[in-house]
Regions:
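N-terminal Rossmann NAD(P)H-binding glycine-rich loop of SDR-like oxidoreductase domains
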Residues: 12, 20
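Active-site helix of classical SDR
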Residues: 110, 144, 152
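Conserved NAD(P)H cofactor-binding loop of Rossmann-fold oxidoreductase domains
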Residues: 78-83, 231
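Alpha-helical segment proximal to the catalytic Tyr-Lys
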Residues: 115, 157-158
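Substrate-binding pocket helix/loop in short-chain dehydrogenase/reductase
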Residues: 86-87, 91-97, 193
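Residue(s) in the substrate-gating loop at a strand-loop-helix junction
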Residues: 128
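C-terminal substrate-recognition "lid" of short-chain dehydrogenase/reductases
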Residues: 201-228
Length: 235
């Protein structure tokens, strides 16, 4: 029997976990790549530290074994690093770490898995509204998410004719642990973020997961940037 496999990074919580559970509910085998384990019955956990550029040498065989026999692979680059930094303060080491997690690791996974990805497979990048705009205090994140959109567009062009499609889903402010860790416990800040969207609320991880699923299964959106942000209020 042919197998469809979701390979997803950072699925121990938030958007990643919601996505993994959604695919699993539809019969997909799920392989999670993260340092923290995934709470998903039947899920395959690969404890790879994507912030270490040398992970390929030690763990590539384990990853390839986890997708053996897959007729279709949906690769979802979800893991992300969000830091508090700015142009006057950001040093090379911290920028390099953000780029490693948010851009370089996805390309490492692309190169490793593409030889075993057949027609009908997909690569979905999880970007951010900040992939096409900027706010103060998140320089490394803004830079890396802009670069991720470029990587998606290059993926579309370089894989033309192979039957593998790609897209970049750019969530707005989503109610995740990462967002709450970044802004702190100030409910007023969270309220302000919610007020920046036309529905007046934060996005749920499940809503983004549904968008990722749609992009993974529909090749017509190949090369597209898909904004999942409830509509932003322009001020």
């Amino acid at each position: 029997m042919s197998t469809s496999t979701l390979v997803i990074t950072g699925a121990s919580r938030g958007i990643g976990l919601a996505t993994a559970r959604l695919f699993a509910s539809e019969g997909w085998r799920v392989v999670n790549i993260s340092r923290s384990p995934i709470d998903l019955e039947g899920g395959v956990q690969l404890g790879i530290d994507l912030s270490d550029a040398g992970w390929e040498g030690a763990q590539s065989d384990e990853l390839l074994a986890s997708v053996a026999g897959s007729a279709r692979i949906a690769l979802v680059h979800n893991a992300g690093l969000l830091g508090k930094d700015s142009v006057p303060t950001l040093d090379a080491a911290h920028l390099a770490r953000a780029l490693q997690v948010n851009v370089i690791a996805p390309q490492q996974l692309n190169r490793l898995l593409l030889p075993v990805m057949g027609p009908g497979s997909s690569i979905v990048y999880v970007g951010s509204t900040l992939g096409e705009k900027a706010v103060a205090g998140a320089c490394s994140y803004v830079v890396s998410k802009h670069a991720l959109i470029g990587l998606m567009r290059a993926t579309c062009q370089d894989l033309a004719g192979r039957g593998i499609h790609t897209a970049c889903v750019c969530p707005g402010f989503t109610d995740t642990e990462m967002l709450r860790a970044h802004v702190g416990a100030d409910e007023a800040i969270l309220g302000s973020l919610a007020g920046s969207m036309t529905f007046g609320r934060l996005i749920s991880p499940g809503e983004v997961a549904e968008t990722i699923r749609f992009c993974s299964l529909n090749p017509v959106i190949n090369g597209s940037v898909i904004h999942a942000n409830l509509g932003q209020v322009e001020r």
